[in-house]
Amino acid sequence: MSDTEDNKNKQTTRRDFMVLTASSVAAVGAVCTLWPLVDSLNPSADVLALSSIEVDLSNIAVGQTVTVKWQGKPVFITNRTPDKIAEARAVKMSELIDPETDEARVKAGHDNWLVTIGICTHLGCVPLANQGEYDGWFCPCHGSQYDSSGRVRRGPAPLNLAVPPYTFISDKKIRIG
C-alpha cells in the first residue's frame, strides 16, 4: 500500500468518527430538548389526585342519597330500597326516552347502590334528589324528570343520568374513577 492510500483510509475513518460523534451529540441534544415537552403532556399531580376517589358507603342509610364531588362534578350515590328497585325494574323499555334496564345501571350483586353523575343531560343543571313524579330526580332548570334508576322519563333531557366508572373495593366502599 502506498502512503496516499493509508491517508485516505485514515481520513475516512476520522471522518466517520466525526460524523458518528456529531450525530450522537445531536441525538442527545434532541432527547434533552424533547423530554420536558413530552413530560408536560402528562397529567399534573393535582389532576391525578382527583382522577379517582374512594367513598365509604357504611354511613348511607337505606333510601338516602348523598352527593360527593369527583373531577369537579357532583356524583349521586343512592342506597335504594327494595321497593324502588322493584319499581325501576317494572318499567317497560317503551316508556323510556333513553331505554336502558335498571340492571345495566348498577353493579351485579350490589343492586341497591346506584351511582350517577349528578348533571342533567339537557343543559348541565344539578337535579334535586327524591323529587318529581317518578320519585327520582327533578331538574329545576327545565323540568326534566328522572326515575329512581336515573333514567329520563319526562322533559327535554335526551339521555339518562350518566353512570361513572366505579368498582366495589368491599361491600361498604367504592372507588369512583
Curated annotation (Swiss-Prot):
Q: What does the record give as the reaction this protein catalyses?
A: a quinol + 2 Fe(III)-[cytochrome c](out) = a quinone + 2 Fe(II)-[cytochrome c](out) + 2 H(+)(out)
User: What keywords are assigned to this protein?
Assistant: 2Fe-2S, Cell membrane, Disulfide bond, Electron transport, Iron, Iron-sulfur, Membrane, Metal-binding, Translocase, Transmembrane, Transmembrane helix, Transport
Q: Locate the residues binding [2Fe-2S] cluster.
A: C120, H122, C139, H142
Q: Where in or outside the cell is it found?
A: Cell membrane
Transmembrane segment boundaries: 18-38
The answer to keyword Zinc applying to this record is: no
The cofactor required is:
[2Fe-2S] cluster
Report the membrane topology from the UniProt record. Answer: Single-pass membrane protein
Q: Which cysteines are joined by disulfide bonds?
A: C125-C141
Task: Please indicate which superkingdom the organism of origin belongs to.
Answer: Bacteria
Instruction: Tell me the CDD domains matching this sequence.
Output: Rieske_cytochrome_bc1 (cd03470)
The record, for Gene3D superfamilies, names: Rieske [2Fe-2S] iron-sulphur domain (2.102.10.10), Single helix bin (1.20.5.510)
Q: Which GO terms describe its cellular component?
A: plasma membrane
Tell me, in one coarse class, where this protein mainly resides: membrane
Q: What is its EC number?
A: 7.1.1.8
One GO MF term, please? 2 iron, 2 sulfur cluster binding
Q: What does the entry's cofactor note say about binding and number? A: Binds 1 [2Fe-2S] cluster per subunit.
Extra information: The Rieske protein is a high potential 2Fe-2S protein.
Give the multimer and partner information: The main subunits of complex b-c1 are: cytochrome b, cytochrome c1 and the Rieske protein.
Report the function annotation for this chain. Component of the ubiquinol-cytochrome c reductase complex (complex III or cytochrome b-c1 complex), which is a respiratory chain that generates an electrochemical potential coupled to ATP synthesis.
- What protein family is recorded? Belongs to the Rieske iron-sulfur protein family.
Q: What is this protein called?
A: Ubiquinol-cytochrome c reductase iron-sulfur subunit
This chain's source organism reads Rickettsia felis (strain ATCC VR-1525 / URRWXCal2) (Rickettsia azadi)
